[in-house]
């Protein structure tokens, strides 16, 4: 089971922590997190949202859709979205979805 947590870090920055298996069973929670980020943006003039994925063990289509939705919302509302501390599974899923990286992700363990 996965988890999503939205944390207001102050200084116009929000961190969204993803951990565990971010799959279809999390779709409602992920949509809620996008709405929560938007509400915080409306209150405090958000300039940056960071998605921390160090604890992600699986990033399925719903997780990738969440990242796209959040990035799109940021483009429309004027805040930057970046990814940090990506686990191997998260990096591979994001890379496979078409986000470019300077370095290719390592191959999955055998």
Residue ranges with predicted function:
Residues 1-58, 62-110:
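STAS-like cytosolic regulatory interaction modules
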């Amino acid at each position: 089971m996965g988890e999503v947590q939205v944390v207001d870090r102050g200084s116009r920055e929000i961190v969204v922590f993803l951990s565990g298996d971010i799959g279809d069973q999390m779709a409602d929670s992920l949509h809620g997190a996008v709405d929560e980020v938007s509400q915080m943006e409306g209150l405090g003039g958000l300039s940056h949202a960071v998605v921390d994925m160090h604890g992600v063990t699986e990033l399925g289509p719903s997780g990738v859709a969440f990242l796209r939705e959040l990035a799109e919302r940021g483009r429309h509302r004027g805040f930057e979205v970046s990814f940090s501390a990506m686990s191997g599974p998260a990096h591979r899923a994001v890379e496979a979805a078409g986000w470019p990286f300077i370095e290719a992700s390592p191959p999955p363990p055998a």
